Amino acid sequence: MAAAAGAAARGGGVIPAGKGGSLRSPGKPVVLADITNTGRPNPTGSVHAIADVLKENAKLRHLLAERNKVIEVSRVELQKIRLALQAMQQKNLQLVQANSQMFAEINQGKDRIKLLQHELACTIAVLKVKGSELEKMSKTSNNQQNRAKILEKKTRSSKCAPTKAHQMAAGSIREHLVEIQSAVPSYTSCHEPPQDKTNKRCTNRRKSESCEVTMDTNTVQHSCRPHVEYNGSSHDDDPRKTRRRRSARLNPGSFEVAEICDKLHEDATVPSAPSSNVPKLQEPNAGKDMICGGKMKSLQKELPCDAIAQVVEAPELKEIQEAGSSVAGGEAHKFDIEDPEPPRKSMRIDANKRKLESFESRLASNKEDCINAICDSTSSVPIQHEQKRKLSRRKSSRLDPGPWEVTNGTFEIVQEDTVAPSAPSSSNALIEQTKNDMQNDRSCSTKPSDEQVIGRRSSVGRPSRRAAEKIVSYKEVPLNIKMRRP
């Protein structure tokens, strides 16, 4: 207000009078100053008003100073807050960086875990595959070992089977031969042939066969000696048997011939032995042999061996012939045996066939030597010529099945000659009879073969020719027409 009054005074205006007086001139218009109180005159108390104004100014200044102080304090606090905020921001950045690093490490760890899991799964799969392969290999190796063992067993059995079968067949045939030889009457008597002729014949043969043939002929000669002359020669027989066995071990052919000669030797020793040895015969003709043995015992005391040989009847001679023919059949059956072997062993089969052929030739040569040695001493000159002709014919046909029958027939003839040396007429008749029988057997054996050949040729004939038929059409015949009955 004081300022307004001072401004009005400076302006030189007239302060209008209020209600107490009218300070304006007449005739002038009304102005704004006339409305306000600035135009009033200063009262007497204006000094006090100035003092109040000064006080008020001081207060205002004091308030301004306080305001300035507050502003400065707020500025300082703001700066502090800004600094704290910057520190917090830095810390936050650090925490964010640490967090990002932690997350990156976690992600890397997860990736590594995944890779390790994948590797572990792959290794497990590989180990499983290797284990399965090892199991398969072990199974296959076990199967191969089992198959190899089975094949070895089969090969061993297949190798042993033919030998066992051959041994069984040979053993059965030997037993059959022994039984047949035991069925022959035991009162044979023969004279010892001169050793010069046998030795000359042996020297004409090969060196490899000479030793075996001489041993076999010597055994046959010792077996054919009459046992009336010596009874207590048991000590002399043992070394002879051992020598014969030693030579027979090296030669399979001479072994069987030696066995046959041993059986003949035992049969020849029966008349001088007691009657307890006679019932050992196991053939169906054993009863007849027992009866004949009783007759021969009664005649032994009265007659010599040559007279006893004449008492033998024709049926007994027939039995001897049948026994010899059965021996021939057994031997022929023995040499015709062929073991069933697989086709892979053709070389072994050929070797066995060669061995059998050599064995047959050795047996034939041994029997021929025995027959010649016996017949030279007992039979006459024309009989010797006939036998020489037969032997020459046999040598040319040793590989045929016929010579076995011929040799066995001659063996029967020799036995009959040894049985009855004092009756040459009966022996000649028997020789002629056996010749006729052998010729008939040969003719019968050859005829069916010719008939079989003719039948085969007729059965394998050429089909009858037909004229060329006219072809109606080259189309295929329908099924219903094909299925029709003719």
Swiss-Prot record:
The keyword Nucleus applies. Highly expressed in roots. Expressed in panicles. Expressed at low levels in leaves. The gene is SGO1. Keywords: Cell cycle, Cell division, Centromere, Chromosome, Chromosome partition, Coiled coil, Meiosis, Nucleus. It comes from Oryza sativa subsp. japonica. Residues 331-346 have a biased composition (Basic and acidic residues). It comes from the Eukaryota. This is Shugoshin-1. Plays a central role in chromosome cohesion during meiosis I by preventing premature dissociation of cohesin complex from centromeres after prophase, when most of cohesin complex dissociates from chromosomes arms. Required for the timely assembly and maintenance of synaptonemal complex (SC) during early prophase I. Required for maintenance of centromeric cohesion before prophase II and correct segregation of chromatids during meiosis II. Has apparently no function in mitosis. Residues 137-163, 187-209, 222-251, 323-346, 382-403, 418-467 are annotated as: Disordered.
